[in-house]
């Protein structure tokens, strides 16, 4: 009788282990494919709970009061709300001393008599700048104001949507400052924080899940009209991934914005699909009458226009 060879049983055991490993690897691969297919290929129905559906599309004034008043000024916002508009869309940036001010361009040159970047100026320096004369030489006193001033002024009069301008991924503190002010004024029901940058919106939700957020997007990089009004050194290109709908589909699942703010030139099939899925969609910025009519006919949550009075008239017809 021969002595058993340990190697005789080891080979089947190795075969069984190898088979289990292959099956486990295949299962992991299948799971990964399914996850990726869901993230990038599936568009589920909107399930947010913080947005109340209006009976008709809302009309917001772009940059305060569109073409009717100085860009991003409280002066403009007061006149837009007095005109009966549902809300206003403005832009927020941090100053050198970490105050959140409302201002569109990264530099102050185009809109004021001063020069330099917003990030390099103190809050006091920014608030001393008058937005009036560059809009109309006869207009004085339309000074830059803080986000807090806007929140205080808009309360009870309409909705304030503020784009937080953060070009990169590094934390700047802008989200914390915005959330602190919303909490201080119990402004959750009339302030929306928006951004092209999904990381910013993710941080906002981590700070306070009840703050309403809006993801802004477009299909192209900046068009010549937008480029023409920005200093060459201030142009921040929109990253390629944020211009691809399949990637934005995944971003929406991870970041979970409450609303979408979609450029009116985005692929119409994308726009129609998101509205059909129940997303509260703002369409920006249809300004020509035909573009306004097309946007309003889609029955979006709202439109943001540089011609808000005409948009309001068309909506109410």
Predicted regions and their residues:
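Phosphate-group recognition and catalysis centered on beta-loop-alpha active-site segments
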Residues: 2-317
